[in-house]
Amino acid sequence: GKRGHGAGHAPGRLGSNLERVIRASIRPVFIAAREFSQVESFLLAYDGGQSMDRALAFLAAQPLLRGLHCHLLRAGKIDGKAERLTLEAAAKLQDAGYEVEVALAAGDPEKAIADRVARHRIGVVLTGAYGHSRIRQLIVGSTTTEILRTCHVPVLMFR
């Protein structure tokens, strides 16, 4: 899980080794939720980066999530390039046999992702992980950490 052995019942607290494990892994990392729930849909938090290219390749090659409804969300700064890349990603997923619903959300990615997960009862989130340096993370914060804190569903992270 994401809270670690010593987390107790402190809400929103992440385990002390979680970031280190994710940063060190060359494979996708699955972070389980506290309780099991049936997964009927998933959200791909798409930012157009290299980690999302790996996520798209994973989804095309693996049958793990095939048959589930895909919410493809682009959150943050939305411009023509972002929209084009998102639609190209949707086409790749459709070519791989996924039913895809595309959503563009200007503004805070962490909030947009958490809101969509809650509103659509999404069962698992796929996202990139720690794409910036630790120094930038200390100053600005980490989208990855906030997603892990605010989404109470399993998360599959790609580096």
Predicted features by range, described:
Residues 1-35, 117-159:
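Gly/Ser-rich helix-loop-strand patches that form or flank binding pockets
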Residues 5-6, 37, 50, 78, ...:
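Surface-exposed, flexible loop/turn segments at secondary-structure boundaries
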Residues 11-96:
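Short acidic/Ser/Thr-enriched loop-to-helix initiation segments
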Residues 14, 55, 109-110, 140:
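Amphipathic coiled-coil/heptad-repeat helices and related helical stalk/stem segments
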